Structure formats: C-alpha cells, structure tokens
Amino acid sequence: MLVLSILAVFLVISSASAQPRIMPEDVFTPLTKGFDLMREGKYEAAQAEFKTALSRDRYNPFALNNLAAIAAQQGKLKDALSYLTDASTYAKDYPQKYQQVCFTEGLCTGVKPVKEVGNESAIAKVIAENMAKLKAKMAATPEHPVSSTPPAMEKVPAEKKGK
C-alpha cells in the first residue's frame, strides 16, 4: 500500500510540473515593452528591452525572434538568422500565446506574448515561418563580393628606371 501511495504522489507531482507555466514577470515586462517600442519604430530601445529579457531567460524565443525581426528590418540578415536559430532551439518549451505585427515586405514577424498559455508552442511556428522567409530572401540576394584595394605600388626614383 505504501508503494502505491508513493507512486500516486509521484504522479501528481510529475503531472503538476509538466503543466505549462506563465512567463515570469521580469521576463514578460521587457518583452511587452520592447514589442511596443518596436511597433513605434524605436528599434534601439526595443533591442535593449529584448536583451534585458534575454539576460533573465537566455533562450527566450520571443526576445530572440523579435531581435531577428529588427535585424532583418535593418538588413542584417545573417544576424537575424542567428537569432532565429537560437530561438528555434527551445521554442517548443514556451506555450505562451501572442499578438503579432508584421514589418514591411513581410520578411519577419515581431511577436508580443500575452499571459495566456496554449497546449503547444505558438511561437515555434512563427519562428519556423520567419526562418523560411529569411532563408529565401538570403538565397535571392547573394552577398556582393567585397572589392579589394591593391597595395600602393612602390615608387622607383627616376634615375633607377630602365636599368
């Protein structure tokens, strides 16, 4: 009987720990502030808020996705892809629902989390879509080769020329 009681307690504890958790306030607040700033076109201030969220939750996919959206808007496609790659690593562990806004050209979608969780990760789908759009954009716009500047030629004094 003791074994069954212990097993029942273990099952209750494990099922309680598997329940989706609401994002901590110290992460949620800078994410929502950053989103509002991003929507207003205040990208530097928004980046600072998203980086604050990342300092408290290193792989937060909302912060990483939004940093990717800003980087893509600024033409920094490699940076955007790097952020999205990090975001995709743990996105499935974040069941929060979100509100969204699109940038012009529809390259990347910025997302604002809400204090409501779903049964599965909604942000993972957004990240996957953003990665696909970004990779297509990168393939369509190959990098321009960087021109090289040859070194200055050595000047030969006039008396040594032709000898």
Functional labels for PLM-detected ranges:
Residues 24-38, 65:
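Alpha-helical tetratricopeptide repeat
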